[in-house]
Amino acid sequence: MLDIKWIRANPDKLDESLSKRGIDSVSKSIIHIDSEKRTLISLIQKLQHERKEKSNSVAHIYDKSSTDFEEIQNDVKLINQKITELETSLLHHEKRLSEIMDNLPNLVADDVPYGTNSDMNKVLKECGTIQNIKFPKHHYEIGKNLGMIDFNTATKMSGSRFVILKHDLAKLERALINFMIDVHTTEFNFFEVSPPCLVKDHAMYNVGQLPKFADASFETTTGYRLIPTAEVPLTNIFANTTLLEEKLPIRLVAFTPCFRSEVGSAGKDVKGMLRMHQFGKVELFTIATPEESNREFEYLTTAAETILKKLCLPYRVVLLCSGDIGFAAHKTYDLEVWLPAQNCYREISSCSHFSSFQARRSLSKYRELCSKKVNFLHTINGSGLAVGRTIIAILENYQNPDGSVTIPEKLRNYMGGQKLITPLTETVF
């Protein structure tokens, strides 16, 4: 959520930021509705004061049958009617303003490049060595040949975009989760938590998922939503909270299953594990002061990059343009891993700086150490990494001509010293 006071003072800057996103200007509408709202509040307060004075004067009239007493009573009645009318109008204006503000995206950072789609994103750097693999197979082909990726059985019970991992690939998934969290906690001082995967609507609103993206998540019949990312519960840990500046920054890491309806993704990545309704993800989250937030954003991104470096997976860092950046994001880096079979880079992590956007919605604040002033915090989060896509990257980049897959060196201790994943000779199902 944006600051209405800032919008009043900077209408042109708001429209400029919206224009970069390809959104029509709304500052005039916001300021007009806000002005009418404030006028209504002023009129209501004036009438309430007048009513109070008249009510006080009644107390000094001892003859309740007098004309003065009756006139004042009639005046108070008319004032009450007028206040009711104005309050109804005020509620209407507040609703209109809230609808606009709730659907207003965050301001894009000054260094975010202009662009209309992902083709205009800016590649900042490429890291790692792309191996020359002759006739590379797709991850789903490799997994099928290993006998360890089962889409058919998953589809029977859950429908499309679900998968069952078996044997060494299930073990690899578990190894990756532990490896990622160990790196983030021991090398980057993130504090591990295990949050809920079901949340109420207000928690989704606080991070910017609602109301705009209501159809992107799964909703239960009892008022809960399955989280699309651990960003939701991690951010809401600090909702309606005022922290002390000396306790900041706070860095959290969590592994959770994530659930997405993938509305609008029909026909996209229909084969394999790239786009699933359920997937595991290690999430990084930081809450910091505005002065620290840019540094913490780079720090969090470095933590996510470190996983790719340790696994020796080729990747690149991309700065998203204004037309591709998320609704709540102020600035976003995507980490894209190389997939040999697709002969291209694909997103494996998205790291975003949200400035005070989420904190304003969730009322997450801090008290300055010296001045004792209370201000809104800044939030930052990113994948560290998406586990399923990391499995995809390992299968494709570490595939061998004989159908086996080499286990990255950093994961071998987590796999009981195992160096290779070889095809199953028999399976339980």
Curated annotation (Swiss-Prot):
Gene3D superfamilies, per database record: Bira Bifunctional Protein, Domain 2 (3.30.930.10), Serine-tRNA synthetase, tRNA binding domain (1.10.287.40)
NCBIfam families registered for this protein in UniProt: serS
Domain writeup: Consists of two distinct domains, a catalytic core and a N-terminal extension that is involved in tRNA binding.
Record localization: Cytoplasm
One Gene Ontology CC term in the entry: cytoplasm
The protein's annotated pathway: Aminoacyl-tRNA biosynthesis; selenocysteinyl-tRNA(Sec) biosynthesis; L-seryl-tRNA(Sec) from L-serine and tRNA(Sec): step 1/1
Sequence intervals crossing the membrane: none
Family: Belongs to the class-II aminoacyl-tRNA synthetase family. Type-1 seryl-tRNA synthetase subfamily.
InterPro entries, per the entry: aa-tRNA-synt_IIb, aa-tRNA-synth_II, aa-tRNA-synth_II/BPL/LPL, Ser-tRNA-ligase_type_1, Ser-tRNA-synth_1_N, SerRS_1_N_sf, SerRS_core, tRNA-bd_arm
Quaternary structure annotation from Swiss-Prot or TrEMBL: Homodimer. The tRNA molecule binds across the dimer.
Binding positions (L-serine): T229, A230, E231, E283, S383
Record's protein name: Serine--tRNA ligase
CDD domains given in the database record: SerRS_core
Alphabetical UniProt keywords: Aminoacyl-tRNA synthetase, ATP-binding, Cytoplasm, Ligase, Nucleotide-binding, Protein biosynthesis
Record field: catalytic activity: tRNA(Ser) + L-serine + ATP = L-seryl-tRNA(Ser) + AMP + diphosphate + H(+); tRNA(Sec) + L-serine + ATP = L-seryl-tRNA(Sec) + AMP + diphosphate + H(+)
GO biological process: selenocysteine biosynthetic process; seryl-tRNA aminoacylation
Function: Catalyzes the attachment of serine to tRNA(Ser). Is also able to aminoacylate tRNA(Sec) with serine, to form the misacylated tRNA L-seryl-tRNA(Sec), which will be further converted into selenocysteinyl-tRNA(Sec).
Enzyme Commission no: 6.1.1.11
GO molecular function, one term: ATP binding
Chain coiled-coil ranges: none
Binding site for ATP: R260, S261, E262, E347, I348, S349, S350
